[in-house]
Amino acid sequence: MMDALMGIDVGTSSCKLTVFRKDGTVILTDTRKYPVYYPQDGWVEQDPEEWWECICAAVSKMMADDKMKEVNIKGIGIDGQGWSMIPIDKEGRVLCRNPIWMDTRAADL
């Protein structure tokens, strides 16, 4: 088995996943795009459910790849464009989209 690491980047326009050896050699990479919403002037949002769906789809695709048969993931690093609270209900469902770093609705505060 080859030890490897997985990086997950939840960016402004897409999530990017990369599996790489400890020496930095890339084994696999996948990118999934999701939309940015502009519901009002100055409002810029994304849907956390879409982040999650993209991450899950990319991980599933990568783990099914033949290159992963001899890979042992030793660690996962997660990075994002800017973190914020995600309101959920008691069943864990996301209640609303999240403002992202480009949102200016609180600029006057």
Language model: regions and residue ranges:
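Carbohydrate-associated surface elements
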Residues: D103
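Glycine- and other small-residue-rich loops at beta-strand/loop junctions that grip anionic moieties
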Residues: P99
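N-terminal glycine/serine-rich phosphate-binding loop of ATP-dependent small-molecule kinases
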Residues: M1-C96
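Short, intrinsically disordered, charge-balanced linker/junction segments flanking boundaries
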Residues: A107-L109
